[in-house]
UniProtKB/Swiss-Prot annotation:
It is an enzyme of class 2 (transferase). It comes from Acinetobacter baumannii (strain ATCC 17978 / DSM 105126 / CIP 53.77 / LMG 1025 / NCDC KC755 / 5377). GO terms for biological process: cobalamin biosynthetic process. Joins adenosylcobinamide-GDP and alpha-ribazole to generate adenosylcobalamin (Ado-cobalamin). Also synthesizes adenosylcobalamin 5'-phosphate from adenosylcobinamide-GDP and alpha-ribazole 5'-phosphate. The gene is cobS. It is a multi-pass membrane protein. It catalyses: alpha-ribazole + adenosylcob(III)inamide-GDP = adenosylcob(III)alamin + GMP + H(+); alpha-ribazole 5'-phosphate + adenosylcob(III)inamide-GDP = adenosylcob(III)alamin 5'-phosphate + GMP + H(+). This is Adenosylcobinamide-GDP ribazoletransferase.
Length: 247
């Protein structure tokens, strides 16, 4: 179960202590448990909506989003901000883009990207709560956590060192594809809405993958984080839009 604890420690702020330093092989296997960690995150979010169901939807949406960000430690938001800064500041140059991504400071474009994504997520969470579709909150982090598998399975990792390199070199490919395929079927519980949400989600990943390859020749940890945030938002958006047009 060590890979599971590695995944839980990496993807959340939950107090997990590992007895030994993870090996590259364990890091690679940990990615198989990312969707399970997503289930834990989503389950907590849904539980909160059930406990505080009597609160105004606006306030509850703010609580859910704040808890969501806290649970993940803002890990993927950090990747989004770094990617946004690098994409604008890199002026189309691969090396400059990669260099800016390594800068720990957050520029104005990075801040703007965080504001936009958080506003969108807040509005979408609010609509889900208001329309009594809070159960879908469980599904969102699960699908978000298969984004790394999809990208690492299909896209070159451009840095020579780091956690991403371990994941790329030691990811169990067959098991990862099976888990990814199963997870992508989960939204079908919601019928046509779920199917449209899956399609929108996958289209966003295909587009982001194309953009990443065109600019830097592949992916980095930051771009994967950005893809998780954007993918989750597109998933929610397409689900909400289809809800109003199909119901």
């Amino acid at each position: 179960m060590t890979p599971f604890w590695i995944a839980l420690q990496f993807l959340t702020v939950l107090p997990i202590e590992l007895k030994t330093i993870p090996t590259a092989q364990q890091n690679g296997r940990a990615i198989l448990f990312y969707p399970l960690v997503g289930l834990i995150i989503g389950g907590i979010l849904f539980l909160v909506t059930c406990i505080f169901v009597k609160l105004p939807a606006l306030l509850l949406a703010a609580i859910v989003l704040a808890l969501w960000i806290w649970l993940t430690g803002g890990l993927h938001l950090d990747g989004l901000a770094d990617t946004a800064d690098a994409w604008v500041g890199g002026f189309g140059d691969k090396l400059r883009t990669l260099q800016i991504m390594k800068d720990p400071s957050c520029g104005p474009i990075g801040v703007l990207s965080l504001v936009i994504i958080c506003l969108l997520k807040f509005a979408l969470v609010y609509v889900l709560i208001e329309q009594h579709q809070s159960l879908f909150l469980i599904c969102i982090p699960i699908l978000g956590r298969v984004v790394p598998s999809i990208l690492f399975l299909t896209t070159p990792y451009v840095r020579e060192k780091g956690l991403g390199r371990s994941l790329t070199d030691h990811l169990p490919k067959t098991a990862s594809w099976i888990i990814t395929g199963f997870v992508l079927l989960l939204p079908l519980y919601w019928g046509w809405q779920g199917l449209i949400a899956i399609i929108g989600f996958l289209i966003s990943l295909v587009y982001l993958r194309h953009v990443f390859i065109k600019r830097i020749g592949g992916i980095t940890g930051d771009t994967v984080g950005a893809a998780i945030e954007i993918g989750e938002t597109v998933l929610m958006f397409t689900f909400v839009v289809s809800y109003f047009y199909l119901v």
